[in-house]
UniProtKB/Swiss-Prot annotation:
Keyword check for Ribonucleoprotein: yes
PANTHER family registered for this protein in UniProt: 40S RIBOSOMAL PROTEIN S3A (PTHR11830)
Species: Giardia intestinalis (strain ATCC 50803 / WB clone C6)
Cited Pfam families: Ribosomal_S3Ae (PF01015)
Family, per entry: Belongs to the eukaryotic ribosomal protein eS1 family.
Compartments it resides in: Cytoplasm
The name this protein goes by in its record: Small ribosomal subunit protein eS1
InterPro entries recorded: Ribosomal_eS1, Ribosomal_eS1_euk
């Protein structure tokens, strides 16, 4: 047979196209608690229910990081530098109802606080709420120069730092130690505790940038369904906040 006479060439290998993974997904809207002005956070994807794998079980306990500037749109600078962590607790009527899971400030805001020639006071305290939560609250504060001060630095003595720490502990205990979690979230979102901390420390020495920089949920109660319904009812949240202000 002549060379090249075999016309049976190699078969073409056709590559199998991978299907789009998002064709098997469904989207659930995420709803924030009633303490915030803009409650619709966005949507979260989850694989559709198939066999023993239920979509609502997979989506439970998901944690979302949301900027406070999106939850409470406004002109306040600190809103855009604060993050809230919200966790899915229940999927009802195709919506993910979330609950408070923590708070933090952004990394660039935290890095911009530090300057030369001042003292940094960093304090944390475990605070139990009236409805069974245990929160770890971190507070940061910096000393500042007095008016018409010639010295460039503003370092203070150890006894002044101890007095500042004691003032922070006392203010946190008075403001957050005897409240429920809905009232606590309201106080964190409108920076009411930051103003109280600044007022308490200004009586001791000059200070700046006194704020709660982080809140961590250490322990939560087992049965939170009743509390979740309270946090997503705007009327009940408003009544709790008004009742707390009247008591104070």
């Amino acid at each position: 047979m002549a060379i090249g006479g075999n016309k049976t060439g190699k078969k073409k290998i056709t590559q199998r196209k991978n299907p789009d993974p998002y064709l098997k997904k469904e989207w659930y809207p995420v709803i924030a608690p009633a303490h915030f002005k803009s409650r619709h956070i966005g949507q979260t994807p989850v694989t559709k229910t198939a066999g023993l794998r239920v979509a609502t079980d997979v989506i439970n306990h998901r944690v979302y990081e949301v900027n406070l500037g999106d939850l409470n749109p406004g002109a306040e600078d600190l809103n855009g530098n604060t993050k809230f962590y919200l966790q899915t607790q229940l999927v009802s009527d195709g919506k993910c109802l979330t609950n408070f899971h923590g708070m933090d400030i952004t990394r660039h805001k935290y890095g911009s606080l530090f300057r030369k020639g001042c003292d940094c006071i960093d304090v944390f305290m475990d605070i139990p709420t009236t409805d069974g939560y245990l929160l770890r609250v971190f507070v940061i504060a910096f000393t500042d120069r007095f008016r018409f001060q010639r010295r460039k630095n503003c370092h203070v003595k150890g006894r002044v730092i101890r007095m500042m720490r004691a003032g922070i502990y006392e203010t946190l205990h008075n403001e957050l130690g005897k409240v429920s979690i809905p009232v606590l979230v309201t106080k964190l979102s409108n920076f009411e505790v930051n103003a109280k901390l600044t007022e308490a420390l200004q009586k001791i020495t000059m200070c700046r940038d006194v704020m709660i920089r982080r809140v961590k949920v250490v322990k939560r109660p087992r049965n939170t369904m009743e509390l979740l319904s309270t946090m997503h009812d705007s009327n009940q949240v408003r009544n709790l906040a008004e009742g707390q202000s009247i008591q104070q």
